């Protein structure tokens, strides 16, 4: 991903129909108030903490300074899958 893509923002948005690990990743960032991992890294200037065994996001710091903690297992329930936005660059 180039620096130009990061500065301009996403080119497309779609809504997923089925759960996947990419949907889980997006769901966790969006619960904390971020668009995706790219926006989080740009704002916080660091990578998020992840669970070592599966790579899921463990802890995120919201824009107001509070922390959001996530389980080791799936957090995005089937009813929330279509509420998640998948951004394309």
UniProtKB/Swiss-Prot annotation:
User: Which parts of the chain are coiled coil?
Assistant: none
Highest taxon above the source species: Eukaryota
Record's GO cellular component terms: nucleus
| Family recorded in the similarity comment | Belongs to the MEIG1 family.
- Which protein, by its recorded name, is this? Meiosis expressed gene 1 protein homolog
């Amino acid at each position: 991903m180039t620096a130009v893509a990061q500065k301009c923002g996403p080119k497309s948005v779609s809504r997923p129909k089925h759960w996947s690990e990419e949907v889980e990743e997006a769901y966790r960032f969006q619960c904390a108030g971020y668009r995706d991992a790219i926006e989080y890294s740009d704002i916080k200037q660091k990578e998020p903490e992840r669970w070592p065994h599966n790579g899921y996001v463990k802890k995120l710091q919201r824009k107001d300074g509070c922390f959001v903690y996530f389980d080791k297992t799936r957090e995005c329930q089937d009813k929330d899958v279509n509420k998640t936005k998948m951004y394309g660059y």
